[in-house]
Amino acid sequence: QALRPAAAEPEVATAMPELASDGELLVELNQETDAERWKRWIGAQGWTTRRAFYPADGQRTDLDDYYLVDVPADQVAELVALMAMLEATGMTDNVEPNEVIRLEFDPARTVPKSNKQLGVDDPRVNEQWAMTALEMDRFYTLLTSEQVKPQKRALVAILDTGVDAKHEDLAANFFSVNKKFDDDPQGHGTHCAGIAGAVTNNGVGVASFARSGDFFRVTSVKVLRAGGSGTQQDIINGIITAVDRGADVLSLSLGGFSTQSRQQAYSEAVRYATDKGAIVVAAAGNSNRDAATYTPVNATGMIGVSAVDDQLQRAVFSNKVNRIEMALAAPGVGIFSTKPNNNYEAHNGTSMATPFVSGLLGVMKSIRPSLTNKEAFKILQETGINTRETSNTGKLIQPARAVGALIGAAAN
């Protein structure tokens, strides 16, 4: 299944989303089926197959049992029947379409201003209304106090279109896991990276959760192409790469409508990440529909993020998260952040809300490296505040209160 960045887009209303052109199906083999038997059977149908994923720690996951199947173009129209046929072979545990959804980017037309003094010298901070809504002045005061000490320098991975690693307001807080991920021809990933981890109090650009570089750095794992599209295989490989390279928090500002009620492959990928100590966060989506029909936010173990505006109303585009097991809200309208080539712009979307949560989680994982996704969500939910539509947004994160609860819990 393939996804796009979750900048605000119109509702997708299509019975069968576009499929990957080079591997239309993702198939999990059962334990009784060896690869050679599978390949012989696929070859007899006139199809081709290849392994989909290569996790470093294969003993922890079933992801290494997944194969891509290339279906001839003249048979793609019969995909539902082909999936049923594969399920009836006795060789598979799971069959899913490898869907593609394309990016539609939404710049913000207006940016609410903030007059509150936050105690940092970033010159564009007055264009970041979200910092006031999140009481970031209290958060910065807490981070610079003697009460809060990082136990490690955490790593927040932005799984997206790439990140401009040379940006003036990102470079000092950026860690590269692979140079091929460190540019961003699209701009979406760089915007998300700045929300989570732009260098703060450096006299340049914008502020973020990186008040001090001691707590976390950001990195990039490129999972979306320059045109803004990527397959389910791309996203899952990105999750594997990020975790295998040591990421503590994975931020997925992407997603799309899915025909699959069971997100088995995505859920297995999230389980692989959480078993290795990481927390995975995903955008709720921007179609003003039920986020339970949107992937990968509907995968088991994922923390989902909805978007609110400066009045703490659910953003008109934000999906409703009442059926997502772990869901939170963050600002997602008129969000001002970094863009490639030392630029800055405002955008709308649950894409923008997601890295607010990811950046905060980066700080929390730094303070308590053993923090799990469920423990983190419990703290963020209990310390969050109501929006004007909490049942459909989840609680709005409050960073200072969350860190205060974390260190209080640690002290106990």
Regions found by a protein language model. Give the residues of each.
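Primarily auto-inhibitory N-terminal propeptides
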Residues: Q1-S114
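Active-site-proximal beta-strand/loop segments in catalytic clefts of secreted hydrolases
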Residues: L29-N30, P97-V100, I158-G162, A196-V199, ...
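Protease zymogen maturation seam
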Residues: R60-D62, E87-L155, V163, E168-D169, ...
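Loop/turn elements at helix/coil->beta-strand transitions in domains of secreted/extracellular proteins
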Residues: M91-D93, K152-L155, D214-R217, D244-L250, ...
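Subtilisin-like serine protease catalytic core
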Residues: Y140-F175, D182-Q232, N298-G301, Q311-Q313, ...
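Extracellular S/T/G-rich loop segment that most often corresponds to the catalytic His/Ser-adjacent loop
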Residues: D160, A278, Y294-S366, S370, ...
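Substrate-binding/charge-relay-adjacent region of secreted/lumenal peptidase catalytic domains
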Residues: G194-G197, S229-L252
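C-terminal subdomain of the subtilisin-like protease fold in secreted/lumenal serine endopeptidases
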Residues: V243-L254, Q264, A269, K276, ...
